Structure formats: structure tokens, C-alpha cells
A protein has these predicted regions:
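Catalytic binding pocket for nucleotide-activated donors in carbohydrate/polymer assembly enzymes
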Residues: 154
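Active-site-proximal, substrate-binding regions of enzyme catalytic domains
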Residues: 2-151, 159-169
Length: 169
């Protein structure tokens, strides 16, 4: 979708292409789409006043907007069409019902740790839910070999909100 750096977009596209050739399919939780839409709408609202964020984080959506000459209206359009783009262009499968993972995540160790570092409990719950989903798909197995892993959770792991150690969980 090219809302990060050109290098990141190229890396993501390569990851998608290679993964497809290896037979992987792509699945996204409905909650993930909603999180992305909320982020895009926030960025759209603040686009005209985002001077500092652009200079602090070169991977911020604001810099992609400058590079691609996107307006607030463009970001709103991207947000409105996000699910359709993921399904029809990128061929992702959407999991619409996530209550089972949401319930498990709410009482998980991960949620209690992540909520200390995320801006909202909703964002922390989403992250914990994704971890619970992957753990269930993997069958609680530890990764031994890259090629034998049946489920990956891919995200942009760089966060400028707060720094915390992944080894906590």
C-alpha cells in the first residue's frame, strides 16, 4: 500500500511474493483492519499539523504522504477501501469473527504486559489477540525450523511509543 518508506514497501512486496510461491496464504483479523483504519483516520486528521512526527520517524505515514502527495482525503479513501484492497488486490482472507481470541487475549499474560506500553487498551488487546491466534494456529509448538512453521504474524516491529523488551514474554 506504500504507506511507509519505499524500502519497506519493497520488502513487504517481496515477502508477499516469496511467501505465495512457498504456498503460504495471508489472513488478517477484522480487528487488525479496524486498527489500521483508526490509525489512518488519526493520521488524516492530523496530516496538516504533523511537522515533528515527520522528522522523528522517517517510517511514519506522514512521510509517505509527502512523498506520494497524498492528502487527508486520500488517506480517508485508503481507509474506507482497506478491506476491499486487502481482499481483492492482495488476496488476503479476512477473519470476521474474533471474539474467541479476544476473550482469551483479555486474560492473557501478554495483554497485561503489552497494555503497559500501548497507547490504549484496545491496541494492546489487539496485539495480544494476534499473539493468541498465532499460538493456537501453531499448536503451542516452538519454532525449530523456519520452513516448518505453519503460521506467522508479520508486523512493523518498530515502535516509537515506548521501548520494551520482547523477552518479557
Amino acid at each position: 500500500m506504500d504507506l511507509n518508506t519505499p524500502e519497506s514497501t519493497e520488502t513487504c512486496n517481496t515477502l508477499i511474493d516469496v511467501s505465495r510461491k512457498l504456498g503460504y496464504k495471508f489472513t488478517v483479523l477484522k480487528d487488525t483492519i479496524e486498527e489500521i483504519q483508526a490509525l489512518l483516520l488519526f493520521k488524516s486528521t492530523n496530516l496538516s499539523s504533523a511537522i515533528i512526527a515527520k522528522n522523528i520517524n522517517r517510517e511514519d505515514i506522514y512521510n509517505a504522504c509527502d512523498r506520494r502527495h497524498l492528502s487527508s482525503t486520500d488517506l480517508n479513501r485508503i481507509s474506507d477501501n482497506l478491506e476491499d484492497t486487502l481482499v481483492n488486490h492482495f488476496k488476503f482472507h479476512v477473519i470476521p469473527q474474533t471474539k474467541q481470541w479476544q476473550g482469551k487475549a483479555k486474560f492473557s499474560k501478554e495483554f497485561s504486559i503489552i497494555r503497559k506500553y500501548r497507547n490504549t487498551d484496545k491496541a494492546a488487546l489487539h496485539d495480544a489477540m494476534a499473539l493468541v491466534y498465532v499460538r493456537e494456529k501453531r499448536g503451542e509448538k516452538y519454532i525449530q525450523e523456519f520452513g516448518k512453521v505453519n503460521c506467522w504474524f508479520v508486523n512493523n516491529a518498530i515502535s516509537h511509543d515506548n521501548d520494551y523488551s520482547d523477552t518479557e514474554y
